[in-house]
UniProtKB/Swiss-Prot annotation:
Residues 18-47 bind DNA. Transcriptional regulator that regulates both the azasperpyranone A biosynthesis clusters A and B. Specifically up-regulates the expression of the cluster A and B specific transcription factors ATEG_03638 and ATEG_07666, which in turn activate the expression of their respective clusters. Coiled coil: none annotated. This is Transcription factor ATEG_07667. The keyword Nucleus applies. GO terms for molecular function: DNA-binding transcription factor activity, RNA polymerase II-specific; transcription cis-regulatory region binding; zinc ion binding. The lineage of its organism: Eukaryota, Fungi, Dikarya, Ascomycota, Pezizomycotina. Keywords: DNA-binding, Metal-binding, Nucleus, Transcription, Transcription regulation, Zinc. GO terms for cellular component: nucleus. It comes from the Eukaryota. Its main location: nucleus.
Length: 593
């Protein structure tokens, strides 16, 4: 009993066993003297104390101090960086005792505050294309977050009060703009469903960025829109970069702005922006390789199938058809990229499979067009889109076959360097596509033209540009007069000018700097250019044809270049609001046209 008590009194504490007991994983019982343990005495082994496994690191305090200093320096750098970013966006902060979180421009109605804070909700894709009331968060007045000027350094992540440079629209004006967007613009590109019960007040509370984007795209005056665009970009910058937000509201607002943006027509990219774009492209291509476009995935195909069989929204049928058309265009563009990247000494053999592939795409396009319901809403707009996609495929087939040997009527490889049947067929099919595109364009009511998205007007400009090339193509085997008899360039521009002038009389376009005015200006200048060179081009073509046929019967058309529709150089620098741009483009030598 006494031995047991002695042993218990002198048993080693946890982590203080001797080396022998530690290795044997046994309990170490110290003797009353504490110099050795009972197990080592019994086994006649040398009892040596082991080092504590819980020994505190002597440098822990010093390491903590070093870490604190590094964190402090990092916080100073973050503060300097965010201060520079805030000064860059030009926020006009007041010296009030509190600062709100970044806020969008909103309506002052029903006694609610004029600003609300964004949510930090993650990006969630709704089950359908309808924006139901169960989506998003409701913004209450008491949800505003404020910080004191004397708060800690974490407050630098909260921006200064957002003061819009333009007054907020009245409730009635906001409702009118939303109604115009819902009934006159969205039907042409129905990527979302704005039900009638979604008022401007609801969007202001639940989709503030989408509300601001709608307000921007329904501003038709160029000068007024530029102000709205700058405010919209400021909201994107502060929400996506400063607050690092990702929500469905930002996505819908961005899609709305990009779909009806007029920036590409007005030369909004300055020299610094272009240099930055080239620098980014150089870095990506040098270090990351060429970046492909977003690939079509099985999940996307399944989503499109669900929309096809679903009848939740009547406009889904139009949207599905638009997506199918764009997929065909994207697949044809992939064939062009493969043709550009081809290597070897047999370009003909490399091009033949791609030409057959483009024929397959053309057949799929015809089947898709045959499936369009005749009673489909906006069928005229959809037909113009389909004609443009076929025109795009035809021109790619012409470009791919330009350096290849021509094909005979049986599809076999021919000989010689004359413009082959394959290329002649592509060019003439393009003439037919342009004629069909124009016929569908003339059928569109003037009231619908006002709300057409950006890609519609881009297709119009590229179609007329290609018609100019086909009308003046200098090739002995190409009959320009037949093209003019089918689609007369000057008469076509006269009809389009008349159509745009009638559309400009719509009540919403009571300003002198809207997009249709600039497009009319472009067509008017091009008509003057075409009329001045019409007779000269005809005389030169007749002379060149006789001269080429008499001098060299193997003269080909490789010297007469027709660029692809997505490689028109003048489209990259277009500025319809600058007279100097017209002078630079239309004042170029005739050989560049």
């Amino acid at each position: 009993m006494e031995r047991s008590k002695s042993a218990l009194a002198h048993s080693s504490s946890y982590g203080q066993a001797c080396t022998q007991c530690y290795k044997a994983k046994c309990r170490c019982v110290r003797t009353p003297s504490g110099d050795t343990c009972e197990r080592c005495i019994r086994l006649k082994k040398r009892c040596e104390p082991s080092e504590s496994v819980r020994r505190r690191n002597a440098q822990s305090t010093q390491t903590a101090k070093v870490s604190d200093r590094r964190i402090a320096r990092l916080e100073d750098k973050m503060e300097s960086l965010l201060s520079a970013m805030q000064s860059f966006i030009g926020t006009t902060a007041s010296s009030a005792s509190s600062a709100n979180v970044i806020q969008p421009q909103q309506l002052n109605c029903d006694g609610l505050p004029s600003s609300t804070s964004y949510s930090n909700s993650s990006l969630v894709t709704p089950a359908s294309s309808t924006l139901g009331f169960n989506e998003g968060q409701t913004f209450a007045p008491d949800s505003l977050t404020t910080v004191s000027p004397n708060s800690n350094q974490n407050a630098i992540f909260l921006s200064q009060p957002y003061v819009p440079s333009t007054p907020a629209p009245s409730p009635n004006h906001a409702d009118e703009r939303l109604h115009f967007f819902r009934t006159r613009m969205l039907p042409s590109f129905p990527f979302l469903d704005l039900t009638p019960d979604m008022t401007s007040w609801y969007l202001r509370q639940n989709r503030p960025f989408l509300f601001q984007a709608i307000h921007t795209v329904t501003t038709f005056s160029t000068q007024e829109r530029l102000t709205q665009v700058e405010e919209l970009k400021r909201l994107i910058f502060t929400s996506a970069l400063l607050k690092v937000q990702s929500n469905i509201d930002l996505l819908l607002g961005l899609l709305t702005y990009l779909a009806w943006s007029t920036d590409p027509f007005l030369g909004r990219a300055d020299l610094v922006s272009r240099l930055m774009m080239l620098a980014i492209s150089l870095v990506i291509s040098s270090h990351l390789g060429r970046q492909d476009a977003l690939r079509w995935t099985p999940q996307m195909e399944e989503a499109l199938r669900v929309l096809t069989i679903s009848e939740a929204c009547p406009s889904d049928r139009l949207f599905v058809a638009q997506v199918r058309l764009q997929l065909l265009k994207q697949r044809s563009d992939e064939a062009r990229q493969q043709d550009e990247a081809r290597t070897g000494t047999a370009p003909t053999a490399a091009s033949a499979p791609r030409l057959l592939y483009l024929k397959t795409l053309r057949r799929e396009l015809q089947e898709l067009r045959a499936s369009f319901p005749p009673d489909l809403h906006q069928i005229d707009v959809l037909n113009t889109h389909a004609q443009y996609v076929e025109l795009y495929i035809n021109q790619l087939a012409y470009s791919i076959s330009q350096d290849s040997l021509p094909l005979d009527l049986a599809g076999r490889m021919g000989t010689g360097s004359q413009l082959g049947f394959q290329r002649l067929e592509c060019l003439w099919q393009s003439v037919e596509n342009i004629k069909s595109w124009l016929d569908n364009f003339y059928k569109i009511p003037c009231s619908k033209l006002v709300g057409q998205p950006f890609h519609f007007w881009s297709q119009m400009i590229l179609t007329i540009t290609l018609l100019k090339y086909l009308t003046t193509l200098k090739d002995p085997d190409w009959d320009c007069q037949a093209v003019r008899n089918t689609v007369h360039l000057i008469s076509t521009m006269d009809c389009m000018l008349q159509k745009l002038d009638l559309s400009s009389k719509e009540p919403e376009l009571q300003c002198n700097d809207h997009l249709l005015k600039f497009l009319s200006k472009l067509l008017s200048r091009c008509r003057v250019w075409a009329e001045a060179r019409w007779n000269i081009a005809s005389q030169m073509q007749d002379g060149d044809t006789r001269q080429c046929r008499s001098a060299n019967p193997d003269t080909n058309s490789h010297n007469y270049y027709i660029p692809d529709l997505d490689q028109m150089v003048f489209m990259q620098s277009m500025d319809l609001g600058d007279d100097q741009w017209f002078e630079n483009v239309l004042g170029m030598p005739t050989m560049f046209y």
